[in-house]
């Protein structure tokens, strides 16, 4: 140090000619001795003596180019070989019994990894029985098998998420492309509609008015037909009402030559005027049919009623009684008994 101070004190304002040659020479021996003593004596102490000050700020410091001290190298290490281990080998790490920091990791062999992969493909959930069976078959501890399955399951989930993400991304791209195509088609169709509307308005402006007029005329014709049918119905109903409102015609007057006695019973009176002896209704009925049988001849006839007018000039009471009995005979009213029994000779003898 004294020599350095003397050299610095005797230095001229300008550098001597051999200054560069002196700077390229190695450090003095006493500096190297001090560095070796510091490394060897303290045994890896972190504090080092400061390097000598640089004589010139423009020249590189030779002390910075020196190799790093050997104190940073890990003692008893494997030389950084753990960084080159694969994922499958790292899955099998974990130490046999929870070892310390300096314990070397145990790596799985290729055959063990293949066996574990086949077991994981069969089922990603590890049961205690299967865990113990795999540990015995592979010569591993159950904790190592459980840790490997846990790490493998995490990687499998990550890969599944990546696959799902890729599938969703493809679906999104396809949906966007389809949406863009639909939007372009929609705009094209809108343009065609606008063009068609403009062409129709320019070329056939009167066509729409003609169609509207024809439609209005058709509506008017339908209205007229409806009104005509309604008027016809009203006329028919008025005629029916008039016919109903008219009084019934009076009956025709009776002829003047007809007697008031026969005016009520014209048919029976004509029958009653047959002769003095009268007309027998049963005889008229028998004449129209077959000839009377012997039984009919021998059997006495039922009591007859003479409808003719008697010689004593019986009035309208006798004619009305005869008409009533004749109507009862024709209608089958045989249960009613006549008020009197007429005689066939036509003369009544009153004693």
Swiss-Prot record:
Tissue expression per record: Expressed in seedlings, roots, stems, leaf sheaths and panicles.
Molecular-function GO term, any one: DNA-binding transcription factor activity, RNA polymerase II-specific
One cellular-component annotation, GO: nucleus
Biased composition (Basic and acidic residues): 114-128
Main location: nucleus
Renumbered residue ranges of the record's region Leucine-zipper: 159-203
Statement: the UniProt record of this protein carries the keyword Transport: no
Biased composition (Low complexity): 56-65
Pfam families, per the entry: HALZ, Homeodomain
SMART domains attached to this UniProt entry: HOX (SM00389)
Record's compositionally biased regions (Polar residues): 228-240
Function as written in the Swiss-Prot or TrEMBL entry: Probable transcription factor.
Protein name: Homeobox-leucine zipper protein HOX23
Source organism of this protein record: Oryza sativa subsp. indica
Gene name for this UniProt entry: HOX23
């Amino acid at each position: 140090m004294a020599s350095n101070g003397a050299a610095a004190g005797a230095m001229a304002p300008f550098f001597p000619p051999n200054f560069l040659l002196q700077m390229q020479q190695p450090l003095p021996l006493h500096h190297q001795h001090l560095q070796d003593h510091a490394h060897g004596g303290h045994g890896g102490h972190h504090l080092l003596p400061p390097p000598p000050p640089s004589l010139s700020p423009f020249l590189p410091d030779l002390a910075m180019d020196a190799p790093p001290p050997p104190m940073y190298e890990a003692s008893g290490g494997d030389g950084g070989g753990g960084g080159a281990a694969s994922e499958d080998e790292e899955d099998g790490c974990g130490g046999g019994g929870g070892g310390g920091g300096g314990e070397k990791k145990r790596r799985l062999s290729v055959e063990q990894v293949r066996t574990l992969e086949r077991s994981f493909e069969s089922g990603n959930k590890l049961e205690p029985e299967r865990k113990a069976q795999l540990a015995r078959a592979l010569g591993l501890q159950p904790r190592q098998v459980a840790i490997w399955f846990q790490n493998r399951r995490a990687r499998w989930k990550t890969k599944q998420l990546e696959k799902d993400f890729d599938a969703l991304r493809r679906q999104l791209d396809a949906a966007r492309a389809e949406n863009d195509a639909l939007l372009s088609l929609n705009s094209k169709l809108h343009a065609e509609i606008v063009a068609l509307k403009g062409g129709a308005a320019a070329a056939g402006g009167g066509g729409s008015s003609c169609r509207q007029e024809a439609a209005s005329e058709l509506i008017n014709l339908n209205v007229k037909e409806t009104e005509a049918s309604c008027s016809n119905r009203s006329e028919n109903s008025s005629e029916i009402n008039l016919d109903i409102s008219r009084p019934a015609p009076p009956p025709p007057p009776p002829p003047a030559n007809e007697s008031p006695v026969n005016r009520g019973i014209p048919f029976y009176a004509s029958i009653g005027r047959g002769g003095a002896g009268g007309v027998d209704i049963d005889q008229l009925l028998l004449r129209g049919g077959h000839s009377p049988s012997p039984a009919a001849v021998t059997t006495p006839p039922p009591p007859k009623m003479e409808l003719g007018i008697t010689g004593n000039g019986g009035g309208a009471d006798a004619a009305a009684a005869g008409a009533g009995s004749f109507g009862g005979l024709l209608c089958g009213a045989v249960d009613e008994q006549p008020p009197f029994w007429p005689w066939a000779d036509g003369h009544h003898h009153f004693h």
